[in-house]
Structures are given as structure tokens and as C-alpha cells.
């Protein structure tokens, strides 16, 4: 049997016309390679930057590199079961996490999934993890305080609602302790907290969660944990996920506090992801956009005005301002604050609390260096009573540090210098504080007043903290009215000042310490 060439061409034509392509190359692709949690995928020509991709086995990934022939994606979670030739699908969605009050008291991973064994979280809303920070018009100036309960911070480096205050120092200088104390002190103050643990040991995170639970702070706190054993992608994303959870409260007229512990490890995780995606390295092998990595995160912490909240809630919440206060943590190497990531974050934030190894080892805890720690906007938010009383403390400490260095070489000192040194020693001792024991405003006011007015000058340095504790106990038992007035007004009137002076004199005579 012979076939005409025309018949053959007709046959081929009908076959081609009848062929239906099973896969759409726009929305599906094939895995070319998998290395260290990074997938190269062929196809997916319609994928968006930052879009969620679906891998086999209910695993998701994030499209980060869009190239001519392939897509570089990072796998969120386990990737051992993914192999070459697997099919990948576009989801058409940007990465979202659950938000809302249902998350309070829970420990979740970077995707908002519970990891504390307390059952599922029935959150009613989800939100995207990458958002544009509020614009200039939507913001309001920082004017309300966040009390950390730490004497040295509330007196010398005050933090306001909506501020970004960096906590920076070497390893083992008490950075996490400062942040956790600040969270514990928000009990009963109406501030919701988010603690983001990035790249820490799982045992360390468990310890922090246990301490928060012991002090009744977990009920108003969300813990977002990306441990050292989690993938670099999860560590990099956890900060943005935590920020979105905090923004939920900010955009409903509430106040929230978020701690990023720590952003150095987030930068390391992002560097790892970027190098695996073959992006060109820059200074210290970080990618070119490592500044943007932190700036777009920290700019989302702000105080927003009532109009912004009304617009976002469609008129449900009126006449309320909201705030998200950020306490990013940066770990330095041998006190080098001029390294790449520390200088970046210092320039983004509104001030820094610098913790020093030498002070920590000398027993000054929290080990805050008062000379180079600053708060660029917190002064406007400081409570009136603390603002009145704290000016002298900072001056005393600064002069003491200067004189102490000079006094090492001088044998005979004049009376004024000796007095200044004695006062400085007592103030340094007074600012020491045990962990998990934050102070209320009236306690801080009483301590500062005693220091400023020379009541500590004839108390032995070793007895200062006992004197302070005795004074607080006496005021609590005998002068409850005075305490209530200071707490209510957050100010010290002339009458209250006279009453406080009389109370301290009375306590000193009794020498109950």
C-alpha cells in the first residue's frame, strides 16, 4: 500500500491539531537541581517575584531569582524528599502568615504554624509578610513612653512608643536579658509583645519561653522561633513574619513591642541564601541589598495616626493611634561596632543601647555604657517625673567615668574631685539591677531622687542596693498615698517632693537597711 505525500502531510496535520498539551509551562515547571534548600526550576514563565510555589509532599517554596531560562527558589522547610524532575506549580499567592489575638501565648515558626504542642491556631485573618512601611503622612511623632523597668534605660536612654532602639553588644553581655525584661515589664500596660528568635539554640528559646510563662508575660506575647536547626530561609523570613503579627495590633489602634533577637543571624541566613542563589557578593560576602534587608523591616515599626487606622479598619476604629516599637538586637565581634551590619542597623535605628563586656564582667548589670548609648527620639516620650530626676544621673556618670580614668594616675585628689568620684561610684552601684525584677515608675523616681539629693553620699557602696530595697519597702507600707499620686500623675509636684524627701529622711533615721 502506497501513501501519497499529500495524504501523509494531512495525517500529520490532523494529529498535530488534535494534540492537547497536558502541562501549561506558564504555571508549572520541573525541578532541575536541589542543593542546600535551593531549587532550580525550568518553566514557570508566569511566576512573580516572591510568589509561593507548591512542591510535591505539601511543601512550599519562594521564588527569589527570576532568570531567562530558570527560576531560583528557596524551599520553606524540609527539602530532602524533593528530587530532580519533580513538578512545581505556581500558587498565585504571596507568602502570608496568620495574624490576630489568637496567636497570643503561642510559639510559632516563621510560617505561623504552631510548634508548642498546644493544638492548632484558629486565626481568623492572614496577612502578607512583606508590606510597605507607613508613609510620612500616616505617621505621628513619638510622645508616649515604653517603660522597660530597667533603671539605666528608663533614666538615661528612654524608649518611646513607635521608636526603633538597637540593643548592641558582644556575645554574653545580657542583650536578650534586657529585651526579655522589657517584655515582662509590659504586664498590665496594654502593650502586646512579639519575640522573634532567629538562629538561636532551641534550648535557649525554650528557656526564654519558660521565663515569660513564669512571669505571666506569655499571655500577651507571641513567640516566633526560627532555631539554628531550621533552614536559612526560615531564619531570614521569621523577622518579617513577626513584624506582620505586630502590625496587626498597630493597625487596630493598639500598641505593640517587637524584639528581633538577633538581626546579625538574620543577615547571615540571608547571605547564605543569596550566595546559594549565585547572587554577586559584596563587602564581607554580604549581597548588595543587605542594607535594604534591615531597613524595610525596621521602617515598619512606627507610630501611626488615627486617620491611617480609620482607613485601614474601614472606619471600625476611630480616634486611636497605634504603634509598633522595635528592639532589634545586634551581636558584635570583639566590640567592633564599625563592621558592616552593625553600622547599617545603627544608621537605620533611632538610637542604641551599647552593652560592654568589661562592665558585665565587673558586675555592672545591665552592662550599659552610658557614654555611647543614646536615644534620639525617646526624650520627648519620657515620663515627666523621670525626666525631672534623670538629668543629674547621666551627668554624674559621665563625669565619674572621665575622672575615674584620670584618678588612676593622680595620687592626691582635691575635695571636689573626690566627692564626684564617690557620687559616681554610688550611682553606678544604684543602677545595677537583678534580672526579671523590673521597677515601677514610683520606685525609679524614689531611687533617682535619693541619688540626686545626696541621700546616698554617706551610705557605703556595698549597702546601696539594700538601702534602695529598704526604701521601696518602707514607701510601699507607710506612704501608699504618695506612691499612688506619683503613679497616677507620672509627675512630682512640690508637695509630693516634700513628702518624698521627708519619707527618705525618716527611713534614713531608722537605718532599716
From Swiss-Prot:
It comes from Ralstonia pickettii (strain 12J). Disulfide bonds: none annotated. It is a peripheral membrane protein. It comes from the Bacteria. It catalyses: ATP + H2O + 4 H(+)(in) = ADP + phosphate + 5 H(+)(out). This is ATP synthase subunit alpha. It is found in: Cell inner membrane. Produces ATP from ADP in the presence of a proton gradient across the membrane. The alpha chain is a regulatory subunit. InterPro entries: ATP_synth_asu-like_sf, ATP_synth_asu_C, ATP_synth_asu_C_sf, ATP_synth_F1_a_nt-bd_dom, ATP_synth_F1_asu, ATPase_a/bsu_AS, ATPase_F1/V1/A1_a/bsu_N, ATPase_F1/V1/A1_a/bsu_N_sf. Keywords: ATP synthesis, ATP-binding, Cell inner membrane, Cell membrane, CF(1), Hydrogen ion transport, Ion transport, Membrane, Nucleotide-binding, Translocase, Transport. One of its GO terms (cellular component) is plasma membrane. The record marks 373 as: Required for activity. Its EC number is 7.1.2.2. ATP binds at residues 169-176. The keyword Ion transport applies. Belongs to the ATPase alpha/beta chains family. F-type ATPases have 2 components, CF(1) - the catalytic core - and CF(0) - the membrane proton channel. CF(1) has five subunits: alpha(3), beta(3), gamma(1), delta(1), epsilon(1). CF(0) has three main subunits: a(1), b(2) and c(9-12). The alpha and beta chains form an alternating ring which encloses part of the gamma chain. CF(1) is attached to CF(0) by a central stalk formed by the gamma and epsilon chains, while a peripheral stalk is formed by the delta and b chains. It is an enzyme of class 7 (translocase). One of its GO terms (molecular function) is ADP binding.
Amino acid at each position: 500500500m502506497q501513501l501519497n505525500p499529500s495524504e501523509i502531510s494531512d495525517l500529520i496535520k490532523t494529529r498535530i491539531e488534535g494534540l492537547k498539551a497536558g502541562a501549561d509551562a506558564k504555571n508549572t515547571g520541573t525541578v532541575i537541581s536541589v542543593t542546600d534548600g535551593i531549587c532550580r526550576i525550568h518553566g514557570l514563565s508566569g511566576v512573580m517575584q516572591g510568589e509561593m510555589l507548591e512542591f510535591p509532599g505539601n511543601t512550599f517554596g519562594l521564588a527569589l531569582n527570576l532568570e531567562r531560562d530558570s527560576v531560583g527558589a528557596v524551599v520553606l522547610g524540609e527539602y530532602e524528599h524533593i528530587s530532580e524532575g519533580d513538578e512545581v506549580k505556581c500558587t498565585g499567592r504571596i507568602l502570608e502568615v496568620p495574624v490576630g489575638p489568637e496567636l497570643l501565648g503561642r510559639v510559632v515558626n516563621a510560617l505561623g504554624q504552631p510548634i508548642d504542642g498546644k493544638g492548632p491556631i484558629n486565626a481568623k485573618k492572614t496577612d502578607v509578610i512583606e508590606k510597605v512601611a507607613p508613609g510620612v503622612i500616616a505617621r505621628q511623632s513619638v510622645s508616649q513612653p515604653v517603660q522597660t523597668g530597667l533603671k539605666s534605660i528608663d533614666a538615661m536612654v528612654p524608649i518611646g512608643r513607635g521608636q526603633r532602639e538597637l540593643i548592641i553588644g558582644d556575645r554574653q553581655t545580657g542583650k536578650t536579658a534586657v529585651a526579655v525584661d522589657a517584655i515582662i515589664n509590659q504586664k498590665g500596660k496594654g502593650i502586646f509583645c512579639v519575640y522573634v528568635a532567629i538562629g538561636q539554640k532551641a534550648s535557649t528559646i525554650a528557656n526564654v519561653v519558660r521565663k515569660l510563662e513564669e512571669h505571666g508575660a506569655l499571655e500577651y506575647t507571641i513567640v516566633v522561633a526560627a532555631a539554628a536547626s531550621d533552614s536559612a530561609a526560615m531564619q531570614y523570613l521569621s523577622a518579617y513574619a513577626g513584624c506582620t503579627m505586630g502590625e496587626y495590633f498597630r493597625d487596630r489602634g493598639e500598641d505593640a513591642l517587637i524584639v528581633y533577637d538577633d538581626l546579625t543571624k538574620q543577615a547571615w541566613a540571608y547571605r547564605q541564601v543569596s550566595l546559594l542563589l549565585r547572587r554577586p557578593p559584596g563587602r564581607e560576602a554580604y549581597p548588595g541589598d543587605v542594607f535594604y534587608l534591615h531597613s524595610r523591616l525596621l521602617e515598619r515599626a512606627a507610630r501611626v495616626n488615627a486617620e491611617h487606622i480609620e482607613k485601614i479598619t474601614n472606619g471600625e476604629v476611630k480616634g486611636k493611634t497605634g504603634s509598633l516599637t522595635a528592639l532589634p538586637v545586634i551581636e558584635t565581634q570583639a566590640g567592633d561596632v564599625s563592621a558592616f551590619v552593625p553600622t547599617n542597623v545603627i544608621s537605620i535605628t533611632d538610637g542604641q543601647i551599647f552593652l560592654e563586656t568589661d562592665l558585665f564582667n565587673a558586675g555592672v548589670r545591665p552592662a550599659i555604657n552610658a557614654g555611647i548609648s543614646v536615644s534620639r527620639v525617646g526624650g520627648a516620650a519620657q515620663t515627666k517625673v523621670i525626666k525631672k530626676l534623670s538629668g543629674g544621673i547621666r551627668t554624674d556618670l559621665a563625669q565619674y567615668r572621665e575622672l575615674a580614668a584620670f584618678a588612676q594616675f593622680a595620687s592626691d585628689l582635691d575635695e571636689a574631685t573626690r566627692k564626684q568620684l564617690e557620687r559616681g561610684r554610688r550611682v553606678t552601684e544604684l543602677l545595677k539591677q537583678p534580672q526579671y525584677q523590673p521597677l515601677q515608675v514610683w520606685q525609679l523616681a524614689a531611687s533617682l531622687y535619693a541619688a540626686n539629693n545626696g541621700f546616698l553620699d554617706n551610705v557605703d557602696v556595698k549597702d546601696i542596693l539594700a538601702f534602695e530595697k529598704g526604701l521601696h519597702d518602707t514607701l510601699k507600707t507607710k506612704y501608699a498615698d504618695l506612691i499612688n499620686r506619683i503613679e497616677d500623675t507620672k509627675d512630682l509636684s512640690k508637695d509630693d517632693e516634700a513628702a518624698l524627701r521627708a519619707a527618705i529622711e525618716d527611713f534614713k533615721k531608722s537605718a532599716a537597711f
